[in-house]
Amino acid sequence: QCIRYAMQENHVLLTFGDMMKVPGTEGSLSDMKGKGAKVELMYSPFEAVEKAERHPDITWVVAAVGFETTAPSYALMMQQAVEKGIRNIRLVTALKTVIPALRWICENQMDIDGFICPGHVSVIIGSKPYEALAREYKKPFVIAGFEAEHILAVIYDLVRQIEKKRSEEHTS
């Protein structure tokens, strides 16, 4: 859907850089840009508001992809656009929540022994949802930050829990 918009006249797709190489049904955004799609990188969704103000003749399509951490910024961006009366911004959403994704994995992928949970999402949702998953699926869920020492500590914690056949939620 993003590529379809990016190929339309007077439409530009805005996306974060990590989405450029993700394969889609017709190729990646990077591939499609080489075939004429109008795709621009953004560092913040609020850039869409600035661009839409400066170029009202263009429809700015924001690829709103992410989890609990990114959804609020898209909502605030749209609120700002509405308050300013900007009508040339569209969202293509693929926003998910972590817990249903983990639940699906637990129900469909039985060969996973434990989970490293995202610290940035956990700041928003807390640790209780992971505690419930640990009890329900009898697997350890450990929250980690992005630093190497956090990840190593979490791996150590997971290995210890798996060895002892424990299933708890921990934070590194």
Question: What does each model-found stretch correspond to?
Answer:
Residues V12-G17, T59-V65, F115-C117, A144:
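Short glycine-rich or small-residue beta-strand-to-loop segments that form or flank ligand, phosphate
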Residues A63, F67-P129:
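Phosphate/pyrophosphate-binding betaalpha-module
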Residues H120-A132, A148-Q161:
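Membrane-embedded hairpin module used as a gating/binding unit in multi-pass transport
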Residues E169-T171:
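Conserved small/polar residues in nucleotide/adenosyl-binding loops
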Residues L95-K96, G119-S122, K139-I151:
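Short glycine/threonine-rich loop/turn motifs
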Residues Q1-D57, A71, A81-K84, V92, ...:
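Metallocofactor- and cofactor-centric catalytic cores in central/energy metabolism, strongly enriched
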